[in-house]
């Protein structure tokens, strides 16, 4: 038998995200800065930050140094009954970075699991309040919170990617998709009034993606809407869960979409950029109020969750280094510049046939088409211009690393022009 190529082995045996078995994939041999090196030796700009995570670029020397130092000491140890310095130092830095808006941190392996933990927190805290009937979540349509079961239940049940599981997932309560950015105060007020009518005796918490709905459609909305949702939670004594897995750590131009706008959630999920895209890791932060309610007998007495790799020392050390880079504040100028360059580079596409909308926020650029995108054709058109993108549905979009230069940003815009035009 001939020795099959790596790509052939991949094609034969490895399952990739959101795909059937046997899909052909491009082979990456190296990453460095904003670049991916492909099997043929060509380099392309990773305009996706490898699914929105590699905000400092790939192989940042501070992250690599932190990882190597930690590997030499302790790469993993169980967190049940034990603790370690990397987790303690990271927690201190993470809480400081949030302006000490939270008091407790639960670490997990991925963003989806951090959402599962957040929902557990809210449901247990409701029981601790003496409200065992509060077993549901209220959210809005066009949302996405992950692919594990309870996280799927708060994704859009019809237009999202999990409609297959209708009837199996826990049933939650859904408001319509939120008004988009630039909506009138009247439209926002009317929306909030209709949302308030859905807060019945079964609702424990409202969970939302603030400012940007990610994989549910890359939809932007206004701060006033988030303020209104927070007000509803306070008025009705319900918990507010914010999923900042995509928006956290500067992606929108604010460090956090909620906290930076003076809003105080009860529970917040972060992930993706937490390690600077170095490895999978996430965290769920909560206030002392939530923690104390969970600690009551009615609340269960303890949070019943414990991943094997919870607070992995290697991930904690790399995350600490990533947050140190964030603390320098360089990201603010970088994201502001990228935003201006994406606006200038993508706005001309607004008037092309087939383009429904062009929108930019921070280091996020979105082109919404009138019809579904031919993913392979659009991807190849961008690759022909030296840029890696990953379209879905009707969307061509980019979330480049913050270190992307002006020249590279211009190249990304050129590639998106080609992807829209199909050449």
Swiss-Prot record:
One of its GO terms (cellular component) is cytoplasm. Its EC number is 2.6.1.62. One of its GO terms (molecular function) is adenosylmethionine-8-amino-7-oxononanoate transaminase activity. The keyword ATP-binding does not apply. CDD domains: OAT_like. Pathway: Cofactor biosynthesis; biotin biosynthesis; 7,8-diaminononanoate from 8-amino-7-oxononanoate (SAM route): step 1/1. SUPFAM superfamilies: PLP-dependent transferases (SSF53383). Belongs to the class-III pyridoxal-phosphate-dependent aminotransferase family. BioA subfamily. This is Adenosylmethionine-8-amino-7-oxononanoate aminotransferase. It comes from Corynebacterium glutamicum (strain ATCC 13032 / DSM 20300 / JCM 1318 / BCRC 11384 / CCUG 27702 / LMG 3730 / NBRC 12168 / NCIMB 10025 / NRRL B-2784 / 534). The gene is bioA.
